[in-house]
Amino acid sequence: MTQMNLEELEVTFTDWVPENSIIKVIGVGGGGCNAVDYMYNHRIQGCTFIVCNTDSQSLKKSHVPVKIQLGSGLGAGCNPTEGRNAALNSQQEIEEKVLNTKTDMLFITAGMGGGTGTGAAPVIAAMAKNKGILTVGVVTIPFKNEGNESMSKAIDGIYELQKNVDSILIINNEKIYTHYGSLLVHEAFPKTDEVLATAVQGITEIINKPGYVNVDFKDVKAMMTGSGMALMGCGKGEGENRIKDAVTGALASPLLNDCDIK
């Protein structure tokens, strides 16, 4: 699996329109929208991006062209019930822009522990499941300093999301914080966006780019349908020890959480 150098792909927004792909990526809530904005800004190919949020002011700041305002636009106040209700009230627009007949695979990315991502992501997943769309959740859980209440909400949200996704990849913000060393917490958030982007990009590249073993969408769907919890590591290497370095990097990847697969 190859990893593009995301830092070299800064984009001028007026000169790129992403393709209308069978693969959709939707960011739900503040954290999810930030991650999808990062993917869009870095020209990740092979998928179509959508952002949705209950906060209309935050939504306007996104560079992603396709936007869905959930509910009245006044935010969810860190209340997952508000996020859920806002998504339920916006089902028609979600169906039209996200779950149309051109969509075969959907990534739902969200930061769990707040109101919109925690409450709305499971609603969107259930809608996708009802349409037979291969659905993958890529979500984060909070930093320790965000408190027990946020973590409790995140766990409840992941439990609800798991009911309706084929596969879920959970990224631990705390591990990203420790993995990259002496970062301030606010400096770790862009790294979270990068890790989320790497996860989505890795899977879309398997489908869209030729490799040593030919894999198409049907192969990925057969493998991921109903597969449950997912693990993914990403590493790269150069020079004489490139294979060893890539494997070592993949095993140390923040995407693996605390799982020991050595």
Write out the residue ranges for each language-model feature.
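Tubulin/FtsZ superfamily GTPase core signature
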Residues: 1-262
